[in-house]
């Protein structure tokens, strides 16, 4: 539960750092309208997000979940999966490259990839939306060292987005974000 939170997300990368249960993932859910606040308001470009069309908001605010959840089908199908991406003319190769995977992966079965590769497909899916804001919920939590390094490398190469990275790893926050916001028990502590 969040309490009295007043936070502006600006261009560049912001890390939300805190222990489990501190409200980091809850905040991401509010930013992408996977949940609405019980009280208070979440603004996007000065407008209450509850006044915005949910699908339009989710096109503008991409989300990479903690655990990859590919849909049945190819990597290309998965990159094209999401609000506004049903148009098969969307080229999945550029976002896949940005996410650190070669386009040779496009015809592979997404369900047969490693967890690290699946996580990069989830990143490519979010990037295919060409979002203004990218939300990352512990994107490397379930990855081994090599896969984690590959995802971090892909994230480090992104430019022109507002990125919100949820992590409990201070070193990762320092590597990837220009701004670190600490949460404890639903409150800002910095």
Go through the PLM ranges and name each one:
Residues 32:
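Helix-to-loop junction immediately C-terminal to a conserved catalytic motif
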Residues 40-48, 57:
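Conserved ABC transporter NBD signature motif
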Residues 67-77, 81, 86:
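Conserved catalytic motifs of ABC-family nucleotide-binding domains
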Residues 89-105:
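Conserved ABC ATPase "signature" region
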Residues 109-113, 117:
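Conserved ABC ATPase signature
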Residues 123:
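Hydrophobic anchor residue at the start of the ABC signature
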Residues 134-138:
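Catalytic Walker B motif of ABC-type/P-loop ATPase nucleotide-binding domains
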């Amino acid at each position: 539960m969040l309490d009295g939170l007043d936070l502006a997300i600006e261009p560049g990368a912001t890390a939300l750092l805190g222990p489990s249960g501190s409200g980091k993932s809850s905040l991401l859910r509010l930013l992408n309208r996977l949940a609405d606040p019980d009280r208070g308001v979440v603004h996007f470009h000065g407008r209450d997000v509850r006044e915005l069309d949910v699908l339009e908001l989710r096109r503008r605010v991409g989300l990479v979940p903690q655990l990859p959840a590919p849909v049945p089908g190819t990597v290309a199908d998965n990159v094209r999966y999401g609000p506004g991406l049903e148009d098969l003319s969307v080229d999945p190769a550029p976002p896949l490259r940005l996410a650190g995977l070669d386009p040779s992966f496009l015809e592979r079965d997404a369900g047969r990839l490693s967890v690290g590769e699946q996580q990069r497909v989830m990143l490519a899916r979010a990037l295919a939306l060409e979002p203004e804001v990218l939300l990352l919920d512990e994107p490397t939590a379930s990855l081994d060292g090599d896969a984690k390094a590959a995802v971090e490398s892909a994230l480090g190469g992104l430019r022109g987005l507002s990125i919100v990275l949820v992590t409990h790893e201070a070193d990762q926050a320092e590597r990837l974000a220009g701004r670190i916001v600490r949460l404890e028990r639903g409150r800002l502590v910095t």
